[in-house]
Amino acid sequence: MSLRVHTLPTLLGAVVRPGCRELLCLLMITVAVGPGASGVCPTACICATDIVSCTNKHLSKVPGNLFRLMKRLDLSYNRIGLLDSEWIPVSFAKLNTLILRHNNITSISTGSFSTTPNLKCLDLSSNKLKTVKNAVFQELKVLEVLLLYNNHISYLDPSAFGGLSQLQKLYLSGNFLTQFPMDLYVGRFKLAELMFLDVSYNRIPSMPMHHINLVPGKQLRGIYLHGNPFVCDCSLYSLLVFWYRRHFSSVMDFKNDYTCRLWSDSRHSRQVLLLQDSFMNCSDSIINGSFRALGFIHEAQVGERLMVHCDSKTGNANTDFIWVGPDNRLLEPDKEMENFYVFHNGSLVIESPRFEDAGVYSCIAMNKQRLLNETVDVTINVSNVTVSRSHAHEAFNTAFTTLAACVASIVLVLLYLYLTPCPCKCKTKRQKNMLHQSNAHSSILSPGPASDASADERKAGAGKRVVFLEPLKDTAAGQNGKVRLFPSEAVIAEGILKSTRGKSDSDSVNSVFSDTPFVAST
């Protein structure tokens, strides 16, 4: 008795005809994979290989039995409402496009997209989002397109798009933004690959002109601003005119949609087209100032190195740059030229600028792969820094000398008024004068001169007594009805002026300035 062992290929070869062997193997592989890996198409959805559409089915979450290897999932017009860490029950590693528009979504929590890490396109348009914050998209490292238009977004946190290093297009049209999202281009969370930003039809009244010059030209050409309620301003007008001259499609294609509000007074205003040539009446100095802020007018100093960048919209990859000087001289990379050098990224360096180097320089960028070319004109002004510094130094010296003279004059006046020195002789004379004045007052108030008073003082005292010894007029006959309060005025006067040698000056003073009241007799 012999034992024969048959393997599966042997058994298949004995039972199945050779022509059907491959078909049976394929069937066995399909059964081995099973429905757990492949998934089924739910009754609420329509499936086509790697595309699943579950639109308008009143879904509040993603069905768990979807095909896990799908690449596109459309869940629009449902009732999802809130995106949290559990709204997708399983992981979809192959999913690269997720459409969630018209779902009344009001909030997005951190970790909502942890099960879809390979998304490249996310559509959250036409929902009810009010804010975007806390880096809710940080798991989407390879996201390229994000649609957030037609929401109620009024605030964007600077860190909201942190980690989206591959994001190229961002749609924010039709929201309630009141400020241009400058943090997308500068700062810690800037998006270096962002080439398209649509913030049209928001509520932005002005642009940050002092920071817009920090945005490279290849990113500037993809900023769409039309439909915002701008306030008429020459700086904004200069910016849009400059974009129009550079043939940016964001301005060329929507020229009539750029409007601004012109206020005639505090209550009345009218809306006008911003890019009309005749209505703004902006001076050349303001326009040139805006171009200088944008980096297209440069100030150079004689002898000081200057570097000028070619801010082209074509970018640096696969782009060749050449410069044309004011004298039509061709400046190319890697060529020896006196005082000039051009880098491969388009930057022009003037080692030691001279007055004759001033003028308009044209940078020509040619991208052969994209069949694009652009010419950027840059104005360079050259001035002498030593002359300007000498004038400034002279002006400073003059001002400082004048100020020092004024301070010295004030100090001298104060010293003269409050700190005038007085010698000893001056002090002695001052004391004698004070003594004479006190004696004179005593002689006036005393009835007679003191025993030790000098002859001059007695004369002075006698002269002073004349005031009190004027003869009293007799008004008894003609008083005209006046009441005579003191019938014996002469007697009282004599009593006051009668000299008593035994009394001191203090007693005389006390007698005159007595607090005892006079009583009128009738």
UniProtKB/Swiss-Prot annotation:
The organism's place on the tree of life at top rank: Eukaryota
**Transmembrane segments annotated in the record for this chain:** 399-419
Ig-like C2-type domain location = 289-379
Any ranges marked Cytoplasmic in the topology annotation, and which?
A: 420-522
Q: Where does it localize? A: Cell membrane; Nucleus
Described by its record, this protein's role is as follows: Required for depolarization-dependent survival of cultured cerebellar granule neurons. May mediate homophilic as well as heterophilic cell-cell interaction with AMIGO1 or AMIGO3. May contribute to signal transduction through its intracellular domain.
Species classification: Eukaryota, Metazoa, Chordata, Craniata, Vertebrata
What is this protein's name?
Amphoterin-induced protein 2
Gene Ontology biological process: brain development; heterophilic cell-cell adhesion via plasma membrane cell adhesion molecules; homophilic cell adhesion via plasma membrane adhesion molecules; negative regulation of programmed cell death
What is the membrane topology noted in the UniProt record heading this document?
A: Single-pass type I membrane protein
Protein family membership = Belongs to the immunoglobulin superfamily. AMIGO family.
Can you quote a single GO CC term?
nucleus
Q: How does it assemble?
A: Binds itself as well as AMIGO1 and AMIGO3.
Query: LRR repeats located where?
Result: 69-90, 94-115, 118-139, 142-163, 166-187, 193-214
Which intervals hold domain LRRCT?
228-284
Residues modified by glycosylation? 104, 281, 288, 345, 373, 381, 384
As given in the record, the signal peptide range reads 1-39
Q: List the disulfide bonds.
A: 41-47, 45-54, 232-260, 234-282, 310-363
